[in-house]
């Protein structure tokens, strides 16, 4: 049985971890995940999906704010793991830790060398890519730059958003890891170096990324909305207040960027730099998420054709 240390945080990671837990060839000695966070207005403490799964299976849990130089680092190095598996962990691994095991493998949600970094799925959708994928790669000190063990891809559908694509890629990543790891560990599967000249990056999403630019084409704004749903959610401004936009559809219409070009009891169409978008699901400041019909019956009833949002 191969003894593993698993490191990851979101549901993507938990899906990969569950695959390893269900496979009798592997023993998970411990998991390392991000600390619990206070979320929402009530500041409720939220544990990571990886921690929740580890609790259910009675696995030792380590949650350092920063792994490098921590007491937890000393403890996990003493576990005697043969190797490390990471998936969307969110921290760099110290060289001393990488050197302490026989192998260290990362499950990365992009077709490397494209989209190294922390938000590959967001960028794949926002950039209008036709496919996304997962790469199983060796870990080195440089971010997502290690040799590639295996790759698998899937089409990005017009109906996909970050949430749906995360779910698809998590399953692909789990299966790809379980399929390729035995041959990799036996030496039968030889890793392939990345073409570093082709590397692109997907840095973590900043608040500035969330703001919609209505001067872009309707397809670009549509992709941006999908690439922010369900988190962190794209927004615009209405009378100085933030208006989150979860879903929209491509529409016809011409006007100034951000201008209301159609308003009925059931629809609100906003002009973009080229074409227009029909808003479907929104969330005004201080209100719950709602359909555009509910919005137009409430806060949005004051909007008129010719008004401009986003200022």
Swiss-Prot record:
The keyword Protein biosynthesis applies. Keywords: Protein biosynthesis, Transferase. InterPro entries: Fmt, Formyl_trans_C, Formyl_trans_C_sf, Formyl_transf_N, Formyl_transf_N_sf, Formyl_transferase-like_C_sf, GART_AS, Met-tRNA-FMT_C. GO terms for cellular component: cytosol. It catalyses: L-methionyl-tRNA(fMet) + (6R)-10-formyltetrahydrofolate = N-formyl-L-methionyl-tRNA(fMet) + (6S)-5,6,7,8-tetrahydrofolate + H(+). Pfam families: Formyl_trans_C, Formyl_trans_N. Its EC number is 2.1.2.9. One of its GO terms (molecular function) is methionyl-tRNA formyltransferase activity. (6S)-5,6,7,8-tetrahydrofolate binds at residues 110-113. It comes from the Bacteria. It is an enzyme of class 2 (transferase). The keyword Protein biosynthesis applies. Attaches a formyl group to the free amino group of methionyl-tRNA(fMet). The formyl group appears to play a dual role in the initiator identity of N-formylmethionyl-tRNA by promoting its recognition by IF2 and preventing the misappropriation of this tRNA by the elongation apparatus. HAMAP family: Formyl_trans. Belongs to the Fmt family. This is Methionyl-tRNA formyltransferase.
């Amino acid at each position: 049985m191969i003894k593993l240390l698993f490191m990851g945080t979101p549901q993507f990671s938990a899906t990969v971890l569950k695959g390893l837990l269900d496979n009798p060839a592997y023993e998970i000695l411990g998991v390392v995940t991000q600390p619990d966070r206070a979320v929402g207005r009530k500041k409720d403490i939220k544990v990571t999906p990886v921690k929740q799964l580890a609790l259910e299976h009675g696995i030792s849990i380590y949650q350092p704010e920063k792994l490098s130089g921590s007491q937890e680092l000393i403890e996990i190095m003493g576990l005697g793991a043969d190797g490390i598996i990471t998936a969307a962990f969110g921290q760099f691994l110290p060289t001393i830790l990488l050197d302490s095991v026989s192998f260290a493998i990362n499950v990365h949600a992009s077709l490397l060398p494209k989209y190294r970094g922390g938000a590959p799925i967001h960028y794949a959708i926002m950039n209008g890519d036709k496919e996304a994928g997962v790469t199983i790669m060796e870990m080195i000190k440089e971010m997502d730059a290690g040799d590639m063990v295996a790759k698998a891809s899937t089409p990005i559908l017009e109906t996909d958003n970050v949430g749906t694509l995360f779910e698809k890629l998590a399953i692909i990543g789990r299966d790809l890891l379980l399929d390729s790891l035995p041959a990799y560990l036996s030496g039968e599967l030889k890793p392939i170096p990345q073409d570093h000249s082709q590397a692109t990056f997907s840095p973590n999403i900043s608040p500035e990324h969330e703001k919609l630019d209505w001067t872009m084409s309707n397809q670009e704004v549509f992709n941006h909305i999908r690439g922010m749903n369900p988190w962190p959610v794209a927004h615009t401004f209405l009378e100085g207040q933030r208006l989150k936009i979860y879903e929209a559809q491509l529409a016809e219409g011409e006007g100034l960027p951000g201008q209301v070009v159609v308003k009925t009891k059931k629809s609100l169409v906003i002009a973009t730099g080229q074409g227009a978008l029909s808003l479907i699901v929104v969330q005004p400041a201080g209100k719950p998420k709602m359909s555009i019909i509910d919005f137009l019956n409430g806060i949005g009833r004051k909007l008129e054709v010719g008004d401009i949002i986003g200022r």
